[in-house]
Regions:
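A detector for small-residue-rich transmembrane helices and their helix-helix packing motifs
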Residues: 1-230
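A short, hydrophobic C-terminal helix/tail in secreted or cell-surface proteins
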Residues: 231-235
Length: 235
């Protein structure tokens, strides 16, 4: 039986929904550049984005999926832990997911950036190349012909992309649910038989790892960066 929603969970749901519709239909600049989480080397990066990105979502399906998970699993976790510990879990998981993603992106960016430095370009020239490429939506492959195109695309994605979503926080709630109630049977609309929480949530995360590797993450923080194509040198 579904637990009734507390004021805490209602507030989280309402804030997420209101900010999504506000940023989508009324204040388009609310998400970018203010509230979405940018790469740490990007001038748009601000410390508050580590919190605010958790209340932004890139599309309606992402919002619905996260809010449905919050609605289904959060009430029983809050009842078990208490409101204070539940909020600590929720935001700590969100912060940890953001820190991990920022760290991975920073390492990946610096690795490719250093490869560009070895070609003889200066840091200033590389950043100018990045900014011009982002503005154009494409880049000149002849700037550093020995660097693989995919590496340049990844560098541009890391620098020019933003991260949004409550998925990291939701993941923390799901892990807590699997740890506290591993054998609780779950009845799901798309599965015609009960499945234990530990198996369902375990499969859920495995699918997300696969999705992250293929670029179609289910629950990971959504990255809203654009794709970039290469131009010939004489363009």
């Amino acid at each position: 039986m579904q637990k009734p929603l507390s004021e805490t969970i209602k507030t989280l749901l309402i804030i997420n929904v209101l900010l999504f519709f506000a940023s989508t239909y009324f204040i388009p600049n609310l998400s970018d550049p203010l509230f979405s989480l940018w790469h740490v080397n990007n001038p748009n990066f601000k410390l508050w984005q580590i919190l605010t990105h958790m209340f932004m979502h890139g599309n309606l399906s992402h919002l619905i999926f996260n809010m449905f998970s919050l609605y289904m699993f959060a009430p029983i976790i809050e009842e078990r832990l208490g409101t204070s510990y539940f909020l600590f879990l929720y935001f700590s998981a969100g912060f940890a997911a953001a820190a991990l993603t920022l760290g991975i992106d920073y390492y990946s960016f610096q690795e490719i950036f250093n490869a560009y430095l070895k070609t003889g370009l200066t840091s200033t020239e590389i950043y100018e190349f990045i900014q011009e490429s982002l503005q154009r939506g494409s880049f000149d492959t002849q700037i550093a012909p020995n660097i693989p195109t995919n590496d340049t695309i990844n560098m541009l994605r890391n620098y020019g992309g933003t991260m949004v979503g409550a998925s990291g926080a939701i993941s923390g709630v799901l892990v807590a649910f699997a740890v506290l109630y591993p054998n609780l049977p779950l009845m799901l609309l798309f599965i015609p038989f009960p499945i234990k929480a530990k198996y369902f949530i375990g499969a859920y995360f495995l699918l997300d790892v696969y999705g992250g590797l293929t670029g179609n993450s289910i629950i990971g923080p959504e990255n809203t960066c654009l794709l970039y194509t290469s131009d010939a040198a004489d363009d």
